[in-house]
């Protein structure tokens, strides 16, 4: 018993070991196969052999500017017009409705008519054949429109509207669109066929099954990569472009190829054309914000000395400092007194005071300044010459001492100045170095998004230099008020640049009202050709489709369906069946008047204006759109 259990346990262990071994081998083989298929993506990117297209500082800036990371302009909204996913949805709706409605054959219409005749035979009592046929005509029309609409909705519910938005973003920034191919799940039309009761619609779906499955497969398995984890580079030797996403190579579509001139990369997209002007405007905005923060600080005061220094003040300071005077101070006092003297008497008083300060013991005041009565006697006095000699000697002595002391002091100050100038230069260099290292270089990028308090703190820490003004100089100009540069003209210029670049690059149409004012901006027939045809052919890989007419952009989906129905061949088939039945059943309606045999306008005419409601409403709307937009379908120029 125990032996059998041990044997059983050994077998189970061997089986589990084999399973683990097989699992390891399969994982290794799968990894090896994946490595072989994606070998190129594992190789390191050599910048010397490749030119980086994306991501780079410049191309990332393209995307930030496109979606207004820092600022958004009025003219920039034209990009939203271009990336309208409703245009792509209407294009797909028009393609499907046009293909399905025109796939109906006259045999199918006749078979429906025969079934109707068999189920509800015509009887001439109380009803004309024309009324009988009209009832079936509008009934079969309603069946066809509802069945086709249900089929189209089943297809379009798998449509990712964001795929067209990403496509527009790529061609406006880089010019290259990376295409992601998703795993192709099995698609089927069986649920759709089961939900439709009309035999005619089921036949249409069955006849166009390959076409519908191809569209359903492509729109469910095709996507456009976003701007994350994408690397796009160009080989310098052969010029081949490679797109990688998470180490996996992607398909791509080149809408606008970049140029390489003098080893420089030149993009040819709208954002590349606007890049330099947008950079200038961004710098202007940053400068404006700095001025706003610096010149609107709560308190900003310019101070100066309130003391007025004149000759009288100097004399008071000298006398207060030291009452005992020496020769230098007496000489300065004498010179200041002379400068204030405006008459002979003032000069005489200045000389008298100077002599009293210098030689009070040897000067006789009566002899120095005598009255006019004693003038004759003073001229004869021998002591006058002695006084003049003493005065002259004292003046010369004071001036020599002053000049010598000034020269000595000047030399000393020059030496000290040279020493301090060197020290100041060294200190300035150290301060500038430390201030530069402390400066937050991220301030330029986030100054617009910071709160006022944080922005003020950051701006005040910038390495600005204060300037001291000497007493002998005056301020010529300064901003002591709120100085903020005006950017109104620059904003208008950028708005016009956005609109002009997009309008002329993609041939957008500006719609105006009766007063000539701009009403809206929309796709033109040129824009549809420039954007939708490459997208349908190269991205979705749909080769057979009908391009959406420009006037259909202003219709709803139901109106598009009615407009397509009014121009398809079903109407002609119905008219043919009506005339044929009139001839076959002429013996039944021989009692009717000849006017009853006349075709009604909605059956006998092929003009859109002849439709009854709601067809006539759609036709008149299309006519009004063509006239108001001046839409003309002419041959597209070769350069486009």
From Swiss-Prot:
Function of the molecule: Forms a portal in the viral capsid through which viral DNA is translocated during DNA packaging. Assembles as a dodecamer at a single fivefold axe of the T=16 icosahedric capsid. Binds to the molecular motor that translocates the viral DNA, termed terminase.
Pfam families assigned: Herpes_UL6 (PF01763)
Organism: Human herpesvirus 7 (strain JI)
Record's protein name: Portal protein
Membership in a protein family: Belongs to the herpesviridae portal protein family.
Domain of life: Viruses
Keyword check for Protein biosynthesis: no
Subunit-level organization: Homododecamerizes. Interacts with terminase subunits TRM1 and TRM3.
Gene Ontology CC terms: host cell nucleus; virion component
Keywords: Host nucleus, Viral genome packaging, Viral release from host cell, Virion
Keyword Glycoprotein applies: no
Gene name of the encoded protein: U76
